[in-house]
Amino acid sequence: DFINAVNMAYEKEESKPAKDAMAQILINSRMCAEGHRPICQDTGIVTVFLKIGMNVKWKTKLSLNEMINEGVRAAYNHPDNKLRASIMDDPAGVRKNTGDNTPAVIHTEIVEGSSIDVQIAAKGGGSEAKAKFVMLNPSDDIVDWIVKTVPSMGAGWCPPGMLGIGIGGTAEKAMILAKSALMEPIDIQKLKERGAKTTTEKLRIEIYEKVNALGIGAQGLGGLTTVLDVKIKDYPTHAANKPVAMIPNCAATRHAHFVLDGTGPSFQTPPDLNEWPKITWDVGPTAKRVDLDTITSDDIKNWKTGETLLLSGKMLTGRDAAHKRIQEIIKKGDSLPNGVDFKNRFIYYVGPVDPVHNEVVGPAGPTTATRMDKFTEMMLDKTGLIGMVGKAERGPVAI
């Protein structure tokens, strides 16, 4: 459903930068399906929604959380498709990586029956960082708040994607509703064709149309499609409150839905490669080839805003944690470690997945550039760095 929705948006897109971005998403996602590797290195924190039949019996001494985390551990350390461990213990302190992407975030509901309904998502941190919540007054307009808030999210959530909206309950209930809404398949075009019949369906269409009218576009490059669908779940709330949560999903949408009935494992069928559109990406005659091994500051002065650059050569990688360590080294007056030389080099804001088999490097999607804004002046002034590669936007401090 997601590939079909991106392709539909690609076909109607009029902005060349946005159309190019969606072409690359479609082409790269097919390559990833062929190679059994993620399109982005951030395979996120595992979120699980369970509906457990009250007649289910367990043949194990493990707790429910232990069983799920054992599955996460096995999946993320699979030798043929090792995924990045992204989960930090002691989040307000030393932030030590747990090493196996556990623990998962688990939501459980007890229902009638003897089966287990499982919805599971591996959602990256870039889109999660743009989650929003507000406690509106009962008389306030939900759509107005969303249309005002979406531009403040920038492009770090990697559109085109989905918006999950949770309305009602309490503050924490609204957030859970928004997250669970993202598990639903894309069907906004079918809804528009048959027409809205409920309040939430009317809201879905109105938000979908007004957010896309903002012109943010794929990867924030300006265009017709920012959201591929809007999902809404609601819950009764207190008369004095109107809690609203909004959580976006990025272009690397990953979720699965299956049922365990006690007869054995549930096998997931990989998508048919024929489901991908047969498209090619033409970089155009104005694209510039850039050799990062020989580039100079004078070369960069000739670049123009909006140009397509085809990079080759070597570049360093690092995110805010690495930048903070560099900052501490420079403050102490110490030298950078042997082999770390930024003079006339580019840095790519990324933490790649470990390579498997004959890979040189694992999947490496860019990190939101604003995370490194506060280190930019130091890197340019103190290290000899001349270029940075990231996604989304830069803030006033960096600019």
Language-model region placement:
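Feature captures the catalytic cores and cofactor-binding loops of soluble hydro-lyases/lyases
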Residues: 182, 186-215, 219-222, 317-399
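Short, charged beta-turn/beta-strand-edge "cap" motif at the junction between a beta-strand
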Residues: 308, 314-318
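Short, structured beta-strand/loop micro-motifs enriched in basic residues and often containing a Trp
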Residues: 285-295
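A generic structural signal for short beta-strands and their flanking turns/coil linkers
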Residues: 161, 226, 286, 307, ...
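Short, well-ordered loop/turn sites that connect or cap secondary structure elements
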Residues: 302-303, 309
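Short, conserved beta-strand edge motifs with alternating hydrophobic and charged residues
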Residues: 160-166, 311-312, 348-350, 387-391
